[in-house]
């Protein structure tokens, strides 16, 4: 899993249930290297997931079929594509995932004022052109209220602070992204690869999600050969808020069905 704030809420519970957890930051973000900072490149981020899989596969306590992926929002979309390319995975959990940028675009546009859309487009184009000239990224907030120039201004976009960092523990958390992402999201459709996912898939869908929408996630899950859909009441960040206990308990139960725990691997080796 990635190390965005509040993912530790799930990581601790998974670890308490007997599962080892490997968490990392995508390049250009958090504690990972890479410049310029705060730049999202979908292919590079998927390559980071692949590197994490390759690293985990070489650890002594990871047996065959001992790797599961967990991703939220954009990372939730990444894990679908990565799982499609890695048929040997044990399972994958996609929580409130970005499944189909084309399907999400009209909803995101409706959440913006015309002036905000114009300003965002101008900033995104300027950022993309500037990158060709080696200029620093033009950053925008990852979330904002309607009328703001931000990556997302849907009604539940601003729930992120309350959900992910309510106590302001993550003082170094950068809530910005290079504006060029606004030109890229509509073409990012990782859910189209769901039919190639051979491992069990748990799709966690928030029924009132106004950011990634439940419909595309359910449709992608139906295309996957071995999928389950967990419906939660609430908006995009509900798995970190009012639906947290329901989400984490269901995810642990799913992992227990499909993923060999680290302590079981150690015990099995001790009996040889």
Positions of PLM-derived features:
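The serine-hydrolase catalytic nucleophile loop
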Residues: 1-12, 26, 215
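Alpha/beta-hydrolase active-site loop
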Residues: 6, 39-60
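Conserved alpha/beta-hydrolase
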Residues: 11-34
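Alpha/beta-hydrolase fold nucleophile elbow
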Residues: 60-73
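Alpha/beta-hydrolase-fold enzymes
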Residues: 80-163
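Short beta-strand/loop motif that positions the catalytic acidic residue
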Residues: 197, 203-205
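Conserved alpha/beta-hydrolase "acid-adjacent" motif
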Residues: 210-216
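Catalytic histidine-centered segment of alpha/beta-hydrolase-like enzymes
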Residues: 234-248
